[in-house]
UniProtKB/Swiss-Prot annotation:
One of its GO terms (biological process) is protein refolding. PROSITE patterns: CHAPERONINS_CPN60. Forms a cylinder of 14 subunits composed of two heptameric rings stacked back-to-back. Interacts with the co-chaperonin GroES. Signal peptide: none annotated. GO terms for molecular function: ATP binding; ATP-dependent protein folding chaperone; isomerase activity; unfolded protein binding. Keywords: ATP-binding, Chaperone, Cytoplasm, Isomerase, Nucleotide-binding. Its EC number is 5.6.1.7. This is Chaperonin GroEL. It is found in: Cytoplasm. ATP binds at residues 29-32, 50, 86-90, 414, 477-479, 493. It comes from Campylobacter jejuni (strain RM1221). Belongs to the chaperonin (HSP60) family. Pfam families: Cpn60_TCP1. It catalyses: ATP + H2O + a folded polypeptide = ADP + phosphate + an unfolded polypeptide.
Length: 545
């Protein structure tokens, strides 16, 4: 297929048009008074969302060059969501503002490479300043405030997440599910999560979520590789008679054995799934033992004189449910005895007290959290399926933002932290590098401007007032239309969200600004069907039979 090559300003301007269209769709969702976006689906009812990344993912433009620009910024939103869990709209708005301002300067003759260098230096300085401005999350109240802001000022969701984190600890596992009623619920269940996903996508039982969901499964634990399925046959036959699912956790399951399990799953002979054992070496053995104690099973280990062939159904662990995605496995309500679990917890605590290695201590604490923390399940209720999806998106965002806040600390919210950080940096740059730094510094006003605009206030006046405020914690509460102490009012953001959004925005904007040529496919118009209107008389050909 023929390709079209476009150069310099013409190429960048086309890319900018795509970025602008994406930004225009995403920016309306920003802030406490942001609006919803209605998205048509190829099947089913349209969805309503106020989640920036959900809007960005749906934007596909007709013009291939514009779509290239939009897709790069869409990637920024998606990457920010993956890394920080929130800040997707902030990243999009910043990327657009930096690209717009940079394009104007490059069109006027600035050197793109020098401009990029200045942008990178400014970004580095602002990130360092944000870290200085941050402070640790002190208590449950602040956790609730972070979650509330991220859940579009929904205090109920904020309090629910704070309760969940209080019950399972900051390192505990919190999952979000759909409730059967219209009420939100919080359930804490004993459970364990480890970072190993399914060995084959053919094990998936929930195609929409791309997860394996096993109800009341047996759990087989083996500390070596499974290469030959013949050794597994005795226990598989016993499992088949019970009609229950089976989860195999082993060092690995090699080609032929895995293929046979997949075939049996697809034919409906066995409801089975398999994951690799977590950890490596001695730590893997210890974690398998943790899982065995939690589920009331035994690790089949050749070191203990046991072979896979000798395994019986009595050696298997059990749980009320197991959920596996491509990255993680969560075991809920293991059937292990509480006394054994408590003894194991105390043993790990003793090891933590004795160890001199920071790395070992960190890994032991991870095991302790998995064994004793349990799993908190937030069940989201709503009157309709559309509302349910929108609300679940907000809870997921809020949960990720809260974890980010606990991880790296908090700064004042509402776009004010970026402006306060900008005021503190002093860069000694010359020429086009100074222009690059100034572009980033000016763009830092964009999130606050957008929040004020969406709330119906004069953006210029709001930004000016926040910039000139004497108290460094002063910002604009768009929900009330007042200038307040953001910390006292509970309007706070995780510093990780601000940092990741800025880094990703500068990264994509600098790539776009240093683009000198684009290559895209030329869309050929497909010939239209010939007019058949003159052939109406052919209907009488039925008489030829």
């Amino acid at each position: 297929m023929a390709k079209e090559i476009i150069f310099s300003d013409e190429a960048r301007n086309k890319l900018y048009e795509g970025v602008k269209k994406l930004n225009d769709a995403v920016k309306v969702t920003m802030g406490p008074r942001g609006r919803n976006v209605l998205i048509q689906k190829s099947f089913g009812a349209p969805s309503i969302t106020k989640d920036g990344v959900s809007v960005a993912k749906e934007v596909e433009l007709k013009d291939s060059l514009e779509n290239m620009g939009a897709s790069l910024v869409r990637e920024v939103a998606s990457k920010t969501a993956d890394q920080a869990g929130d800040g997707t709209t902030t990243a999009t708005v910043l990327a657009h503002a930096i690209f717009k301002e940079g394009l104007r300067n490059i069109t006027a003759g600035a050197n793109p490479i020098e401009v990029k260098r200045g942008m990178d230096k400014a970004c580095e300085a602002i990130v360092a300043e944000l870290k200085k401005l941050s402070r640790e999350v002190k208590d449950k109240k602040e956790i609730a405030q972070v979650a509330t802001i991220s859940a579009n000022s929904d205090e109920k969701i904020g309090n629910l997440i704070a309760d969940a984190m209080e019950k399972v600890g900051k390192d505990g596992v919190i999952t979000v599910e759909e409730a059967k009623s219209i009420n939100d619920e919080l359930n804490v269940v004993e459970g364990m999560q480890f970072d190993r996903g399914y060995l084959s996508p053919y094990f998936i039982t929930n195609a929409e979520k791309m997860t394996v969901e096993l109800s009341s499964p047996y759990i087989l634990l083996f500390d070596k590789k499974i290469a030959n399925l013949k050794d597994l046959l005795p226990v598989l036959e016993q499992i088949q008679k019970t009609g229950k699912p089976l989860l195999i956790i082993a060092e690995d399951i090699e080609g032929e054995a895995l293929a046979t399990l997949v075939v049996n799953k697809l034919r409906g002979v066995l409801n089975i799934s398999a994951v690799k054992a977590p950890g490596f070496g001695d730590r893997r053995k210890a974690m398998l033992e943790d899982i065995a104690i939690l589920t009331g099973g035994e690790v089949i280990s050749e070191e203990l004189g046991r072979t896979l062939e000798s395994a019986t159904i009595q050696d298997l662990g059990q749980a009320s449910s197991v959920i596996i995605d491509k990255d993680n496995t969560t075991i809920v309500n293991g059937a292990g005895e509480k006394a054994n679990i408590d003894a194991r917890v105390n043993q790990i605590k003793a090891q933590i007290a004795e160890t001199t290695s920071d790395y070992d201590r960190e890994k032991l604490q991870e095991r302790l959290a998995k064994l004793s923390g349990g799993v908190a399940v937030i069940k989201v209720g709503a009157a309709t399926e559309t509302e349910m999806k929108e609300k679940k998106d907000r809870v997921d965002d809020a949960l990720s933002a809260t974890k980010a806040a606990v991880e790296e600390g908090i700064v004042i919210g509402g776009g004010a932290a970026l402006i306060k950080a900008k005021a503190k940096i002093k860069l000694d740059l010359q020429g086009d590098e100074a222009i690059g730094a100034a572009i980033v510094e000016r763009a830092l006003r964009a999130p606050l401007r957008q929040i004020a605009e969406n709330a119906g206030f004069d953006a210029g006046v709001v930004v000016n007032s926040v910039e000139n405020a004497k108290d460094e914690n002063t910002g604009f509460d768009a929900a009330k239309g007042e200038y307040v102490n953001m910390l006292e009012s509970g309007i706070i953001d995780p510093v990780k969200v601000e940092r990741v959004a800025l880094l990703n925005a500068v990264s994509v904007a600098s790539m776009l600004l240093t683009t000198e040529a684009t290559i895209s496919e030329i869309k050929e118009d497909k010939p239209t069907m010939p007019d058949m209107s003159g052939m109406g008389g052919m209907g009488g050909m039925g008489g030829m039979m």
